[in-house]
Structure formats: structure tokens, C-alpha cells
């Protein structure tokens, strides 16, 4: 059986990147919450 995690920088950026987060209301909330928490990295 193949492992489930097959890393790809492109897929990671498209699914969890900053622009992907900003595209939806929920994603914007995620960014806002992480900003409020003071995270150094806001998204993948």
C-alpha cells in the first residue's frame, strides 16, 4: 500500500497557501485568528 503523504510544494501552496486562505470567508477567519495569536507563519 502506498503511503498517504506524497509531498508536493505546489499542491501544498494551492490548498493551504495564503491566496487559497484569502479566497474564502472561512480562510480569512483563519488568517485573522493566526494574526491575533501572533503566529510568525500565517499559512503554508
UniProtKB/Swiss-Prot annotation:
GO process terms (BP): translation
Record PROSITE patterns: RIBOSOMAL_L34 (PS00784)
GO terms for MF: structural constituent of ribosome
Entry annotated with the keyword Ribosomal protein: yes
Pfam families: Ribosomal_L34
GO cellular component: ribonucleoprotein complex; ribosome
Gene3D superfamilies on file: 1.10.287.3980
Keyword Ribosomal protein: yes
Keyword annotations: Ribonucleoprotein, Ribosomal protein
UniProt cross-references to HAMAP family, sorted A to Z: Ribosomal_bL34 (MF_00391)
Family membership noted in the UniProt record: Belongs to the bacterial ribosomal protein bL34 family.
Stated name of the protein: Large ribosomal subunit protein bL34
Species of provenance: Paramagnetospirillum magneticum (strain ATCC 700264 / AMB-1) (Magnetospirillum magneticum)
Amino acid at each position: 500500500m502506498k503511503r498517504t503523504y506524497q509531498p508536493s510544494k505546489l499542491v501544498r501552496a494551492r490548498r493551504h497557501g495564503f491566496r487559497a486562505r484569502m479566497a474564502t470567508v472561512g480562510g480569512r477567519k483563519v488568517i485573522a485568528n493566526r494574526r491575533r495569536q501572533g503566529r510568525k507563519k500565517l499559512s503554508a
